[in-house]
Amino acid sequence: MTMEEYVNAYYGGELGISKRYGISKADDLTYTSDPSAAFNTTYGATVYNQLNTKSEVFKLLKKEPWTQSGWRVMTGRHATTAGVAENNSEAGGTLPDTDKPDITNVEATLKQIVSTWEISTKAAMLSEADDGLGNLAAFMRKENSEAHMYAIDDMLLATTDTVTAANFESLDRITADHTQRAYIANADADLNIYNITRSTDDWSHPTMQLATPGSAGHAALSLSDLDTLIQGALEEGVNYADLIFLTGYDTYQDLKALMQNDGANAAWNYNLAQGGAGNMNGVTGESGLAFDSRVGSYDGIPIFLSQHVEKDTTSRIHLLDMGNLAMRIAAPTTYVDSTNVAVTQKMSHEFALITAGELICYKFKTQGSIRNLNG
């Protein structure tokens, strides 16, 4: 019921105050001892989620059908183009040597991500009675759907040295440079991806910026870090319109403060037009100038936030070339159930959510990251 209905019922209807508290004109002492045993706490059918279930990373990535497990990349261009030298005694000269571009085959492994749960027939029946959750199956499906997407986002940003082979590949691994492996505390094999050995395949190295170049030391973010990262992607031929930044909430706040302190006045403003006080549930806040320091982009590159971005001391920053990233999907998120107890031979129903595919990177050098930040 609504709050208004509850109040009306409490003061005059089925929950009337006289019924609730036993108010009467006569002195009618009902209890002569502690009545605590007469009370039973009830909890209601609503569960208030205390967890941040916001998941956006999977949604950011374009989706492609899984039509093949491999693809080809060109890692070197034709290299013998040259002018023909004239021969003094002949009209023509010798042609340059023939050559061809270098082409490498890359292959990905299909990953199947599964969230399973089980509800006993007894729990399902009692959820509609007593002090249950109501439709328990619907509740579990909703909450586990959120948990499924949360887990996928967590995989997509897992730090390079903890990526599980059976999970989706990680953007954190894609944006990690093998040549600077010693400064990010990774084993040699941690940075290998698909069938690529990054210690020998230089074409698979992204643009990575360390807070303290050439060192494992941590340092505060600077705008020059961002500029260097962008420059590296531009030099590799990125389409500027395809770039986004992905970072955590703490580094985002550091970036806001940095832009203000460096005099980037376009990043913040006092808005005289928004002088009214805020209002929530009948309570009025303070009136005055509206100060807005939110940063939606840097140099025209949109900024996105995720709680899953790995922290060194503070969250890393990923520069992603979205035109060369995709989720290749073999099976979109699918809900399956087994509710026939004659088949399962137990008094319970089983459920699962399944997503099958893999994170694909078509070009590494236009991806990048800033690491070892501490503010």
Model-predicted regions and their roles:
Residues D153-S170:
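Short, glycine/acidic-rich hinge or "gate" loops at secondary-structure transitions
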